[in-house]
Amino acid sequence: DDKIDITNMDIYEDNSVDVFLCSHVLEHVDDDRKAMSELYRILKPGGWGITMVPVLIYSEHIIENLPITSEAERWRFYGQGDHVRFYNRQGFVDRLACAGFKVNLLGVEYFGADTFERNGIHKRSVLYVVEKI
């Protein structure tokens, strides 16, 4: 396992990764656009990845860049001391697409309830499956 900065994955060459899993990481990253660009850069054409973030279903936009900097303030606002944003569904999809990805939203109806349950994924969760075409 490699421990690296997701916004600067220079240990990986361009187009060198077949598949990635990025689960509940991007909401912690100050520059999530750079992280998404790095994921796109290292992914091989035809490769794919699964991304998951907490999403506010009823929000009309991503909530970020607030003057909330202390861990205590983040706990009060985000419910976790190291989150830096709340995503909404369309905003998250748009950011992934801006990085170059084709984005597919796949849920329990695609994978099946048994698969979700076996992997500890909530039945209302959506997996953002991205592809580099």
Please annotate each region the language model reported.
Residues 1-9, 57:
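Class I SAM-dependent methyltransferase SAM/SAH-binding core
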Residues 3, 25-26, 86:
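Alpha-helical architecture
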Residues 7-20:
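A short acidic, Gly/Pro-enriched loop at the edge of an enzyme's catalytic core
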Residues 18-30:
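A short SAM/SAH-binding and catalytic strip from SAM-dependent methyltransferases
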Residues 30-40, 44, 48-133:
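S-adenosyl-L-methionine-dependent methyltransferase catalytic module, highlighting the catalytic core
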